[in-house]
Amino acid sequence: MNTANASLPPRGALRYLSLCVLTTLYSPLATASEPEPVTTLQTITFNARQYTPAKQTENVRHDSSVKVQQADLLNQYLPTVAGVNVGGTSGMDQHIYIRGLGSDNAGSALKITVDGVRQPETRGFHHAGISGLDPDLYKTTEVSVGNNSVTLGNNAIGGGVAFTTVDAQDLLLPDQKMGAKVKLGYASNDQQFQRSLTTYAKPNDQLDMIVSYSERDSDGGEDGKSNHIQGDDITIKNILAKVNVMPAEGHKITASYQSYDNDGNYPFRPNIGYQANLPANIHPGYTNNETYALGYEYKPHSNFELNSKIYHLTNESLSQGLRGTTPMRIATSGKTDGMTASIKQQLTQHHGDHALTHTLNYGVEGYKKSATLESSDITEDATSVGVYLQDRIELGRFALTPGVRFDHYKPSERLSSDDYNQLSGALAGEFKLTPNHSLFASYTQLFNGPPLPETIHQSGQTFVNKDLEAETGANAELGISSRFQGVFDSQDSMSLTAKVFDTQYDNKIDRLTGIDCATGNTVTGGQCASYINAGETTVKGYELSAKYRLNNMRLNAGYAHAKSETEQGYQLNKDSGDQLNLGFNYDINDKFSLGSAIRHVKGLTRRTSATAVADLPSFTTYDVFGSYRPSALPQLTVDAGVYNLTDAYYYEHVSNTGDKAMGRNVKVALSYQF
């Protein structure tokens, strides 16, 4: 039995609190006609579609530039969140990173879900991505920048990203019982042509349903120097089908199906870029995900909510090409079967003139993941079960949130003869200095069971380290949040947030190559790879954000800094330079809206070993976009924009240096709703 230390004292106190104030916070994600996005102490929520105010629920929904930009990849909108980067240019190589941690060849450090369904956590091939995700299907994206809650659990030491898909009630116009939306889009750089049809209905209060199909064709596109990128003859298809049944007051049953299919001629090693794979390593490849889910919700009143879900996800991928002079065909498959159940309950006690409120959040999550290399008979799997209890206690201006979680993680016998058990705790606090100014702090213990090896290395190319320890650690944060009214004008408002963080990781897992396949030792000419515990790693930094609004105008800005240091004095290989985001949005009237965005990433010298030093250049991108809805045809919306306006030639710091980003891109989309 391998039992991780359940009591991890903080090693390294937070030494500073940055109170830098910016006059604007980046988020071209909102328009003045809708309320602010939901921003809690540790979680950012924003939306990717347009909704009528009458349909708003707990998460405040609003217009966002995701719709205007017609984002088809995560890298086109997620980096607007301070502390978040997305590597990979194509849909075959998308990787989310939060403060330098994400989905890499050492496993996944982020919990990524769609409608509560955990996405695949194991790569088929270390040069490719984990899963395909399409922003066009989502209505909200919730980003946990860092792990600050016992609710996240295993495979979430860096935080999490939760996508939620659209429902019929989100799209129905006032007084409609059924409707449809047709969308046509074109992007100039990769000559992408998009078409989609979404139908939805709510015939009565007991039933609503939605079916959506979209398809995109493209040829890959070019970088800022007119070099071809991504691939050729690419077709991406998406299907979403969802039915909600409300058999009685407070009860809801949801059945859903999602499918993502990406097929095209792709580089054998997508992450090193198209040009580096020429001339012989461009071949047909694909990735496909299918998800079936069944959920139940019980909400008899506003103080009690139960949510449960069971799901089955399958994924397949194919990469083929030459490894040296040897032809390779890497066909992989995997599946994840899981269940979740959680309860949120609010209890209030009155003590004289004071009210003591408990908001309880408790639940269980279990899932089994497996991965298979089709050319072998080996399947690796792992099972994870976690239970948690969290209580937010509010009294006057004080709020305290203790939490506790127990995780049990069991990989297959071939990987380890042990199981892993971890008892983790968390404590967060908030103090309202005034109704508009709050201090907050949190401390969360972390756990991440050893990952399944990438599927390709199940064919004898991995030395199995059965002594691998689980990753553990702790994340501490401290910050201040303020809101102001009437700053420069009686009608304006401003919000400011600043926080610092200090995250310690023990037994950080890393993947090494050049390993002797028999002994596991590092040798010259070693043909195997292996996973090791590389020791302690520290990530420290700060994130600043602000938001200004005056009538129909918004100015926004955000700044993020994170720096890692390993036990050997080096950095993580996905450290990124400091990032500044600026944005402007203006609703001219109910027909026209305009926006712009600037993103600057500072240059960085990244040293990951004694001999590996990379000088990563800075880059700046500029976007302009707008939307028009003609009075004579209000059901029609025209969205247009120019992205990477200056045709900058660059690569993301979390991408391979050869994986260049897309150059200037002009997008136009027509949407008709009836």
Question: Where in the sequence are the language-model features?
Answer:
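N-terminal periplasmic "start-of-domain" segments of outer-membrane beta-barrel proteins
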Residues: L41-Q69, Q94-H95
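Membrane-embedded beta-barrel scaffold of Gram-negative outer-membrane proteins
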Residues: L184, K299, E305-G321, L439-F440, ...
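Flexible loop and strand-edge segments within Gram-negative outer membrane beta-barrel domains
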Residues: G220, G224-S226, Q230-D232, I236, ...
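Gram-negative outer-membrane beta-barrel transporters
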Residues: H358-L360, L395-L400, S493-Q504, V523-S609, ...
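Outer-membrane beta-barrel translocator/receptor signature
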Residues: L137-T140, V145, V150-K225, D232-I239
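Short acidic/polar hinge/loop motifs at secondary-structure boundaries
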Residues: R118-N147
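Surface-exposed extracellular loop regions of Gram-negative outer-membrane beta-barrel proteins
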Residues: D261-N265, R269-Q275, K410, F431-E477, ...
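Extracytoplasmic beta-strand/coil segments of soluble accessory domains associated
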Residues: N75-V117
